[in-house]
Regions:
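Short, positively charged and aromatic/hydrophobic N-terminal segments
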Residues: 5-9
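Generic preference for hydrophobic/aromatic residues in regular secondary structure cores
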Residues: 21, 59-63, 81, 98
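Aromatic side chains
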Residues: 27-32, 52, 89-93
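N-terminal first-folded block
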Residues: 10-43
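A short, structured beta-strand/loop element
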Residues: 32-68
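C-terminal structural segments of small proteins and small subunits
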Residues: 72-102
Length: 102
């Protein structure tokens, strides 16, 4: 798996409506500025999209235009970066929400 350097969201966010957490394999892992709980992440590349919930564990919610092998890769990336994604969500939404670390 490709190694990524995780940056604070404000260091890589170039679109205030769609804050980017990181990009990998051409996918932009992000959320929308008006997103809602449960905490989740969107992976977007062109017209390919997938959405993963992070609680209680990582789970695919929806996808469009993503091949099965890419979905497995995206899920693995989200699992491996779950803590960072949650941390960035809480920072961005200025939340002191507590959550169970799995």
């Amino acid at each position: 798996m490709q190694v990524i350097k995780l940056l604070p969201i404000f260091a890589v966010a170039n679109d205030k409506q769609k804050p980017t957490i990181f990009t990998l394999y051409g996918y932009r892992f992000m959320f929308y500025s008006n997103d809602h709980e449960p905490i989740h992440v969107h992976a977007i590349k062109g017209n390919s999209r997938a959405k993963f919930d992070l609680f209680p564990t990582v789970a695919l919610v929806s996808s469009s235009g993503v091949k099965a092998h890419e979905l497995r890769l995206l899920e693995q990336i989200v699992v491996e970066n779950r803590e960072h994604i949650i941390e960035q969500w809480l920072i961005y939404f200025n939340s002191d929400r507590r959550y169970e670390r799995n």
